[in-house]
């Protein structure tokens, strides 16, 4: 496995931190980063982490007390004594550079988002995909159009007959592409749309490896695209007092 001399989980940690920084910048939420961790300086929307470890040796003090959930990328911590509980654990997946075999279903229109209206459409279908098809959200609540100012962020829509049914994001760093937010609405699943969106979000034209943290339901999809597990993360949330 070639990771250009880097720990593959370090590539994952850097990608997720940069993706968070991009969205929080668009949302107007301050953040900071040093060698140990990326941290939000004000509470972000619940879909975002408030702290992300950047190396396995990160001290607990670098993340405890952050204004939201903590992403422990190497599963280095036991934060229970500090009043946290495990919310979820996910594997880190890595795929070497190169195109993925296969083609998008002919009825699927893949759109790379480039306008404010398309960002709003992306946000709407993301909510309908991750929650339910009746879910609604005020524009810009999670994904404001200001993110278009970041050329490293690639956002994709999948449309059928002009209506968005899926979405995905690819975030390019110097060493990898992080794939985030792959979803399709319930009525459009098991038709190859998520696979096509993932292929696009991998940005294979960059010649960079791709990384992501799959849900349990999505593992087999990504394995078929050539991803393999290289580590695991733990998401910690503060317990009620």
Please give the residue ranges for each predicted region.
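A short, well-structured alpha-helix characteristic of acyl/acetyltransferase catalytic modules
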Residues: 116-128
């Amino acid at each position: 496995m070639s990771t250009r001399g880097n720990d593959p989980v370090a590539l994952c940690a850097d990608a997720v931190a940069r993706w968070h920084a991009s969205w929080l910048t668009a949302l107007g939420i301050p953040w900071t980063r040093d060698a140990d961790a990326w941290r939000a300086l004000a509470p972000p929307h619940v879909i975002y982490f408030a702290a992300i470890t950047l190396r396995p040796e990160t001290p607990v003090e670098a993340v405890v007390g952050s204004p939201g959930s903590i992403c422990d990328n190497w599963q280095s911590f036991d934060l229970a004594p500090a009043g946290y509980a495990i919310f979820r654990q996910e594997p880190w997946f890595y795929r070497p550079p190169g195109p993925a075999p296969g083609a998008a279903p002919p009825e699927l229109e893949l759109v790379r988002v480039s306008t404010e209206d398309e960002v709003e459409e992306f946000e709407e279908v993301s909510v309908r995909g991750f929650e339910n098809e009746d879910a609604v959200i005020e524009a810009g609540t999670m994904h404001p159009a200001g993110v278009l100012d970041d050329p490293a962020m690639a956002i994709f829509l999948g449309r059928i007959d002009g209506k968005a049914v899926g979405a995905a994001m690819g975030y390019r760093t110097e060493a990898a592409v992080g794939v985030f937010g792959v979803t399709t609405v319930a009525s459009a699943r098991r038709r190859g749309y998520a696979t096509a969106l993932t292929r696009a979000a991998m940005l294979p034209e960059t010649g960079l490896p791709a990384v992501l943290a799959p849900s349990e339901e999505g593992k087999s999809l990504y394995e078929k695209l050539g991803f393999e597990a290289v580590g695991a993360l733990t998401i910690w949330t503060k317990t009620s007092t």
